[in-house]
Amino acid sequence: MAKMLKFGEDARRSMQVGVDKLADTVKVTLGPKGRNVVLDKKFGSPLITNDGVSIAREIELEDPYENMGAQLVKEVATKTNDVAGDGTTTATLLAQAIIREGLKNVTAGANPMLIRNGIRMAVDKAVEEIKKISKPVEGKEDIARVAAISAADEEIGKLIADAMEKVGNEGVITIEESKSMGTELDVVEGMQFDRGYVSPYMSTDTEKMEAILDTPYILITDKKITNIQEILPILEQIVQAGRKLLIIAEDIEGEAMATLVVNKLRGTFTCVAVKAPGFGDRRKEMLEDIAILTGGTVIAEELGRDLKEVTLDMLGQAESVKVSKDNTVVVNGKGNPENIKDRISQIKAQIEETSSEFDKEKLQERLAKLAGGVAVIKVGAATETELKERKLRIEDALAATKAAVEEGIVPGGGTAYINVIKEVEKLTSDVQDTELGIKIIVKSLEEPLRQIASNAGVEGSVIIEKVKNSEVGTGYDALYGKYVNMIKSGIVDPTKVTRSALQNAASVSATFLTTEAAVAEIPQKEPAMPAPGMGMDGMY
């Protein structure tokens, strides 16, 4: 297929138009007085949001060169979202500023390769200084502040802080749509997996159709149990001990199932059987997790263990087990805390090593089940449009909170970028064009605060000067229009978000400046549809 070509200044300017179109759409959402953007959807109601990456993903431009520029900046937002989960609007804004300032110098004859070196030097210095002013997150109050700033809603901040307090930093917090109007928190403590009882006759509470076992023994095996004789020796020992039993097996059917159900109905012995969670290798790992959590042993075929030889010390134990039609929850397993800690470290190492997003997600779930539990935030609203918008804000706030726990917090509202300018300005280079690269970053670091001020309806330049000349940590509270100590006032950003936004923006923008030619496909003109025939065939 034939291609179109553009060179030099012409190519860069065309792409810059696309960058500006995307960034101008996204940047109106920045700050406490930022507005929302409406995104049209082919199906369902339009989406109203202030989430930078959701807006960027929707933008496709007609002109192929402009679209190239827009797609490059879209990558900045997407990468920042992948790494930090928030800060996508800031990243887009910084990319626009670096490209704008950089192109002025390239047009004036500066060498883009040397400018790129200066940009890299300045960004490395800025990131180093951001880390120096970073403070660790201390307690529930700091977590609530980070989430509240990200979501622009104190109630959401409190909700996320509660969730993190209950399941711990390693716990999994999921966000679901609620059927009700309100937003609420639901916490599942202990290990939950999505397998229910194999027979409804095993339920102990017929009204709720649940089986609740207090201090049960837990038999964990990857075998299929069909013959009651296989497990009869261990069943007799459990009956003598006067305890209940949970069986986790590949499957339980035939005579074995019938015998257990009959004994349950007669009141002789309470036993609940569930199928093992997961599939293939993941099933083996999950059974091992359950065994470590409950202090039991997996009776596995490949390890040469036989069900007839099982003794009580091979069984796991827990404070209680709750089994419904679809789920099983094991609360307070009696496993050795040291073994559980070692297993958690092992899973963390696997998370670091894996490159697959799917595997990472599954490992994270296993980690949460071992470490704390699962919290579900159920988002409610009056209409579907409001629900989608609210859900996106909570997702961003949750990601920001996790980032803050990892790397700490810095003064928010663009203040951290202003605070590091003095140190970046001290950088020097013998090469003039590299010096220009440093100055480009110094100018671009002002942009987030300028935009926050602009969205609040005030002149940014005056505010930037005032913050520059104030002590580190003092910034502009755009909501109330006053200068405050940002950390004390609870206006904070996660260090990881602040750092990632700058690094990703600089990475793409510096490469953009080195562009000397652009190649695009010639748009194909769709032929007009032929007009339908008006006559009726075969009639005269």
UniProtKB/Swiss-Prot annotation:
One of its GO terms (cellular component) is cytoplasm. ATP binds at T29, L30, G31, P32, D86, G87, T88, T89, T90, G413, D477, A478, L479, D493. Its EC number is 5.6.1.7. Pfam families: Cpn60_TCP1. Keywords: ATP-binding, Chaperone, Cytoplasm, Isomerase, Nucleotide-binding. It is found in: Cytoplasm. The keyword Transport does not apply. Its main location: cytoplasm. PANTHER family: 60 KDA HEAT SHOCK PROTEIN, MITOCHONDRIAL (PTHR45633). Together with its co-chaperonin GroES, plays an essential role in assisting protein folding. The GroEL-GroES system forms a nano-cage that allows encapsulation of the non-native substrate proteins and provides a physical environment optimized to promote and accelerate protein folding. It comes from Clostridium botulinum (strain Eklund 17B / Type B). The gene is groEL. Signal peptide: none annotated. Forms a cylinder of 14 subunits composed of two heptameric rings stacked back-to-back. Interacts with the co-chaperonin GroES. HAMAP family: CH60. It is an enzyme of class 5 (isomerase). GO terms for molecular function: ATP binding; ATP-dependent protein folding chaperone; isomerase activity; unfolded protein binding. GO terms for biological process: protein refolding. It catalyses: ATP + H2O + a folded polypeptide = ADP + phosphate + an unfolded polypeptide. InterPro entries: Chaperonin_Cpn60_CS (IPR018370), Cpn60/GroEL (IPR001844), Cpn60/GroEL/TCP-1 (IPR002423), GroEL-like_apical_dom_sf (IPR027409), GROEL-like_equatorial_sf (IPR027413), TCP-1-like_intermed_sf (IPR027410). Belongs to the chaperonin (HSP60) family. The keyword Ion transport does not apply. This is Chaperonin GroEL.
